[in-house]
């Protein structure tokens, strides 16, 4: 859905154009931006700059604060891990937002993800599933982050453990994630995440520098 922002001169701009000028701080545009946040949740799209602009407008206009939009922005930022979007969003929260119980729950979920305690995350996510059921693709976005961590941590991993880390998924769903990440089966119980050929190999480079090459430079320093 295309969102156009109407300026005082009667002309219209896209949200991206509006965010590039002083109009991003105009509270008259907040409703349009909030609607844009809701569309991101519905359509599995993401615009960090627009979402941060909403939180900034809440800072300048606390009386316009919308907690439901706040929750959506924070949860959407989790879908872009391992990037630091959540930290940036959290830094813009007002004291009354920080004291909110749901905000604290989301912060706890973020902390759990950042320390890679994925089993606990899925347990907490199940308890609080109504909080993000309106966010399309939320679970798969988190699984993408889990896959990233697994890919940088393991060389091989047991299938049962991998299924648990990905949220207790079924075998058929596991197969799709194995294919998506380019992993391979090893026997019945193991998944090969990275081979030795995938590992980055360091190489020492030695360069011989003759005195004649630096003599003139050293003379200038005397």
From Swiss-Prot:
Q: Where is the PCI domain?
A: 46-208
Q: Which UniProt keywords apply?
A: Cytoplasm, Initiation factor, Protein biosynthesis
Q: What is its main location?
A: cytoplasm
Any Gene Ontology biological process: regulation of translational initiation
Q: Return any one Pfam family short name.
A: CSN8_PSD8_EIF3K
Can you tell me which residues the record assigns to a coiled coil? Answer: none
What GO CC annotations are associated with the protein?
A: eukaryotic 43S preinitiation complex; eukaryotic 48S preinitiation complex; eukaryotic translation initiation factor 3 complex
Localization of this protein: Cytoplasm
GO molecular function term, any single one: RNA binding
What this chain does, per the entry, is described as: Component of the eukaryotic translation initiation factor 3 (eIF-3) complex, which is involved in protein synthesis of a specialized repertoire of mRNAs and, together with other initiation factors, stimulates binding of mRNA and methionyl-tRNAi to the 40S ribosome. The eIF-3 complex specifically targets and initiates translation of a subset of mRNAs involved in cell proliferation.
Subunit info here reads: Component of the eukaryotic translation initiation factor 3 (eIF-3) complex. The eIF-3 complex interacts with pix.
Family, according to the entry, reads as follows: Belongs to the eIF-3 subunit K family.
Q: What is this protein called?
A: Eukaryotic translation initiation factor 3 subunit K
| Species of the source | Drosophila grimshawi
Kindly list the organism's lineage. Answer: Eukaryota, Metazoa, Ecdysozoa, Arthropoda, Hexapoda
